[in-house]
A protein has these predicted regions:
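Charged, alpha-helix-forming regions
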Residues: 1-93, 98-101, 105-173
């Protein structure tokens, strides 16, 4: 897989079939009715039963609407994936206006994969793959892939852009 910063977003290319399958599964993970996923995405926030009930009645529905709205944007971008040419494979364009939706959705998908595969922090340690079932090992790889996309979207990955000494000098004044 490769990625680049475009004028109006981020372009991810040469996506493998596994990457495409993972990405296409993201909306389904967010929409899961599995109680473990719902509990992870909307955890208990108050020890007091009355406060928790109030939060569930008033705040949780709004968060659910946000999940739905973000998932709609992500699904729209996924439906627009195309093969540009034979060598570049499938490409995904994430417009700047959708980056926040993608970040939130990717994070939620990672949380869902974690709980659906009954994982613990130990699965992500240096020797964690030794304790993983094959299904958990696959989930670890998918979680790392989604985290890598988040890193790109957060700007934590060098895009190979050369520094402009004039801009850098002006910024330091």
């Amino acid at each position: 897989m490769w990625f680049m910063r475009a004028a109006d977003g981020y372009l991810f290319g040469a996506l493998t079939p596994s990457c495409i399958e993972t990405l296409r599964g993201v909306p389904m993970l967010i929409e899961s009715e599995d109680e473990r996923v719902r509990a992870r995405l909307l955890p208990e926030t108050y020890e007091d039963h009355e406060s928790e009930a109030h939060w569930r009645a008033h705040a949780a529905p709004e968060l659910e609407r946000l999940f739905v709205a973000r998932t709609v944007l992500v699904r729209k971008d996924l439906m627009a994936m195309r093969q540009l040419d034979f060598d570049s494979g499938i490409v995904l364009m994430i417009p700047d206006s959708h980056v926040n939706a993608w970040l939130a959705t990717l994070n939620a998908a990672r949380l869902a994969l974690f709980v659906l595969n009954e994982m613990t922090a130990a699965h992500f340690e240096r020797k964690g793959l030794k304790i993983c079932t094959p299904k958990q090992a696959e989930a670890v790889a998918r979680i790392h892939f989604l985290a890598g996309m988040q890193e790109v979207l957060l700007g934590a990955v060098d895009h190979g852009e050369e520094e402009d000494p004039l801009t850098d000098a002006a910024a330091s004044e």
